[in-house]
Amino acid sequence: MVVAYKHEPFTDFSVEANKLAFEEGLKKVESYLGQDYPLIIGGEKITTEDKIVSVNPANKEELVGRVSKASRELAEKAMQVADETFQTWRKSKPEMRADILFRAAAIVRRRKHEFSAILVKEAGKPWNEADADTAEAIDFMEYYGRQMLKLKDGIPVESRPIEYNRFSYIPLGVGVIISPWNFPFAIMAGMTTAALVSGNTVLLKPASTTPVVAAKFMEVLEEAGLPAGVVNFVPGSGSEVGDYLVDHPRTRFISFTGSRDVGIRIYERAAKVNPGQIWLKRVIAEMGGKDTIVVDKEADLELAAKSIVASAFGFSGQKCSACSRAVIHEDVYDHVLNRAVELTKELTVANPAVLGTNMGPVNDQAAFDKVMSYVAIGKEEGRILAGGEGDDSKGWFIQPTIVADVAEDARLMKEEIFGPVVAFCKAKDFDHALAIANNTEYGLTGAVISNNRDHIEKAREDFHVGNLYFNRGCTGAIVGYQPFGGFNMSGTDSKAGGPDYLALHMQAKTTSETL
């Protein structure tokens, strides 16, 4: 009997002991910066000449690590190992699989600040963002372990007096996990452990800019007792290894988190039945958003401004849930805008390894160039009242940017930016605000700041997003509390951290015995 699930608490860094412990975590990570990490296939550590080089986005000269890069030949070897291992792993007891997750969670909990420090160095996350990422990784393992225990005996169905009917879940097969760089620990660990605890074997291809934290997680899984071959670590390029594995006839499902364009490409490729393939592949996809905070005229305006700033600029706006549009009732528009500008100008953009830094860098040069191109668009489509500047001389730093008076059909209101840029748009009334918020191909998160109960209930029904929040920001979903996933081009509405997520990695089997 396991204790009831409760999410991992965030660390209070105002407590001196916690601050010192995190600093020790940073020192430990700094002691092994620049190391080489192998591929892992069937428990065999394989070193290749071709490497993925991971650098600190806050300091391009600092090498975080070098990870061996898989070729198609090695990807094929990994597929064969995973396929063979599945024949035994699928018959393993769910209790044993859940126990591995619980042990892995305990190991990460003991090394919490070390893993967070890796995220500071490799992903450019400030302390609080890194700590939340690690806590979420722990949450996924604790939650999915418990969910598997709930599903292990199936779901009751009806039986007539002459029969005994059972409805049970069995694993799918080999899953390809393609994880993102923005939550390189939490989402990577969640996608991987959901697949393995459901009885599947895994080919893990982490994001190319953040592979070291995934390599360190492989160490955790091994220490937790995961048998060799269940999770195979195959970092590589999307065009070479990613496409090969997505197309492979032995791939049973693909779990992907990333951009809309790549997600669509995977979805299209997975739909094709290739020679030797005897099933229709399943795709579990989360693909981003164009998320809006709507501010009603009857609202706590200070809460509104703080929610917009926190949701827009947390982790430099590099969250699929980030607020990139603030749609505000015209009667309170100027007040909320001016207060948001004041709060934004108080933010510090600096080295995320320093406690108190609000914003670190963006992910890499490509991200920097893309975001700055949208800043340039913002100068044409509105008025820049805060930020608007970037500096990529040492790291990829961009100032938090507010663009005011943006038209509802402007590019800044339509296209995902994935950086610290938020567009402010004026609405005539609440219905108009909801119409603007829904005027996008995405549907991931949104928030409404309002004291009007009728408007809240209208939004609950008509604001078309997978995660809708009232009187708070639009980021920060907690595993098991706010299952996360969106509509439309935000993905397949696969609710990570929710009660139906594991079922996506399994197939239902009905057995009926005549008595």
Curated annotation (Swiss-Prot):
Record: active site: 286, 320
InterPro entries in the record: Ald_DH/histidinol_DH (IPR016161), Ald_DH_C (IPR016163), Ald_DH_CS_CYS (IPR016160), Ald_DH_CS_GLU (IPR029510), Ald_DH_N (IPR016162), Aldehyde_DH_dom (IPR015590), Proline_metab_enzyme (IPR050485), RocA (IPR005932)
Catalysed reactions listed for this entry: L-glutamate 5-semialdehyde + NAD(+) + H2O = L-glutamate + NADH + 2 H(+)
SUPFAM superfamilies named in the record: ALDH-like
Name of the top EC class for this enzyme: oxidoreductase
HAMAP family xrefs: RocA
GO molecular function, one term: 1-pyrroline-5-carboxylate dehydrogenase activity
Pathway recorded for this protein: Amino-acid degradation; L-proline degradation into L-glutamate; L-glutamate from L-proline: step 2/2
GO biological process annotation, one example: proline catabolic process to glutamate
Family, as annotated: Belongs to the aldehyde dehydrogenase family. RocA subfamily.
Entry EC no(s): 1.2.1.88
NCBIfam families documented for this protein: D1pyr5carbox2, PRK03137.1
Record key words, sorted: NAD, Oxidoreductase
Superkingdom field: Bacteria
One GO cellular component, as annotated: cytoplasmic side of plasma membrane
Lineage, broadest ranks: Bacteria, Bacillati, Bacillota, Bacilli, Bacillales
Protein name, as recorded: 1-pyrroline-5-carboxylate dehydrogenase
